[in-house]
């Protein structure tokens, strides 16, 4: 079977990349932008860097800011109504995964109104038309939602997150400018950075991995390992390296899937509103230990990309253990907790395990699992 890789039509990378937004919109004849960004980014002037460019060009726009850190069905429905009221014809989404996931769902429903029930988009969505033309501008180095064919929505009523997979939702243009990430606080930088590392590692060991995705993921692991500590300290080199590393990770995992770490993390965010990156970072070492018996021989390449000393002289078991230790060390260095104490409630484990097993990311895990085994993994994280 042939491998399929879906990416943005155009992407811009590097300092000053945002200067290309208005020219791209005007060249295509668009008349009014729907700016999708959250209140904090507006408050701290990050969104203003883009709206200032639109103002300078006298390009009309409307701002939608009703976005939660774990976007809900209601956020999407309100956004669809706001887009229609604004009479916009394109989307510029500015933010992390929450803003971009919200924008993706809005854009899909506007052009595919038969999917107005957001829940109907879960899984591999059978939409017929591409979403509204979108330019995505990430302000975090982690989710890579600007280059993925996935988005995640929280169902508050059912206390779960669901993943939507749709090649029609990928933004036509990604603008990855490290200057847009410089205002991220340390904690958010660490959490989103570890999310990016989880994308790269899970994508590398997933059942669906292929030669092209392997190339992307190993380079992403290298860039993230070399630059996350610096990015947390807000060094220009660290920010630039992470901006590129997280994007390359997205180029890979979007096309081949993830695994049990993400399936377990989604439930924590839905039930407790735990930041997704923090949940992934805490669970990642446990997931690697769990998958070691099936995918451990692939850990050597991960460890090598992370710069583990002497890994070529180790046997497979030693290399796998050294790789897991390197992941734990990086996580500790950027201040991520080592367990779910204070987050996870024992009485919720059955529900969370069932949700994780049903999650769209779970089938890609290299080791076949069960609700009972996932329950034990959660218990081990208390």
Task: List the predicted regions and their residue ranges.
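C-terminal catalytic subdomain
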Residues: 256-322
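N-terminal small/polar loop signature for handling phosphorylated ligands or for N-terminal nucleophile
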Residues: 42-115, 229-239
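Short glycine/serine/threonine-rich phosphate/pyrophosphate-binding segments
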Residues: 18-21, 43-46, 73-76, 99-103, ...
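Glycine/threonine-rich beta-strand-loop-alpha-helix active-site module
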Residues: 74-179
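C-terminal charged capping/lid subdomain of soluble metabolic enzymes
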Residues: 299, 309-382
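Carboxylate- and glycine-rich phosphate/diphosphate-binding segment that chelates Mg2+/Mn2+
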Residues: 150-256
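An N-terminal, well-structured beta->alpha segment
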Residues: 1-64
